[in-house]
Amino acid sequence: YDIESLNAGNVQYESVRKLKQELLQKAYEGFLENVYGRVDSRADDFEAFYRKEAAWLNDYCVFRLLMEREGGSQVWQNWPEDFRSKEKAIEILAEEEMVSGSSDLDKKLRYYAYVQWVAKSQWKEIANYAASKDISLMGDIPIGVSLYSVDVWANVEIFDLDWYGGAPPEKLFKDDEFVQKWGQNWGIPLYRWDVLKERHYDWWRQRIGKATEIFGMFRVDHALGFYRIYAFPWNPMRNEEFLPLTKVEAEELCDGNLPGFKPRPDDSDEDKAANRAEGEVYLSMIKQSAGLAEMIAEDLGMVPD
């Protein structure tokens, strides 16, 4: 690799990603050969991390392994049918390992855990150094996550895959005809807040808890979306298809649905009150989950009355 060339000009993402992956793989092999399974504090640290983070880490490792098998594609809805379900995928991988009698599968899964361990260790070093200088790090919590993420794949029951968050039409976007006509379609699945409520908002609490292990403060992106969020009844991959359509034509393709505010617009005092009450519950839950960390709400957009 020509490191000087990689450091010059714009970031060459694919080349840099390939180089980092090769270096991380070599580091992992060295870790297994010289550290893992021996009396070494680093081996103990890794095992402790592996156990402590199991609630999310195990799913992540399986997701990354399946991505690798699918040529790096994270579009899990296009994977073989058995891999689209977390439970079925784990069952198949377990059967593979049993039949082969090899530990290669476990080794591959632990590679992805190793990379996360390295990243978390580096973040902790940065946070500790910042704290020694009386500096608090600030993180960012987007309101949504990508459809093609381990979060959605592993927790599909808490996401509404029929609706995608975004923003209303904006005439100031002169160079974007779609945004002027329909709005911004961010492609983030909406939450099934009723399901999350039954689970005591476990996914959100874990998300905030992990962020505050490093950050002393964090920005909540699009806080207004917790009260009501503009949503689309189609995936943004279909935006071009909908661009030339009339509202009537779009409705026909979406079972009578059109983009609009969810769970309801602020069209009446009753709806406004309901949206406000629900939003306060969700943001209060996030604030409570943050403990001593400071929460900063970003309110860009159409602020309700």
What are the functions of these language-model segments?
Residues Y1-K120, G144-D305:
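Alpha-amylase-like alpha-glycosidases and glucanotransferases acting on alpha-linked glucans and related
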Residues A119-S132, S136:
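Active-site pocket-lining segments that scaffold enzyme catalytic pockets across diverse folds
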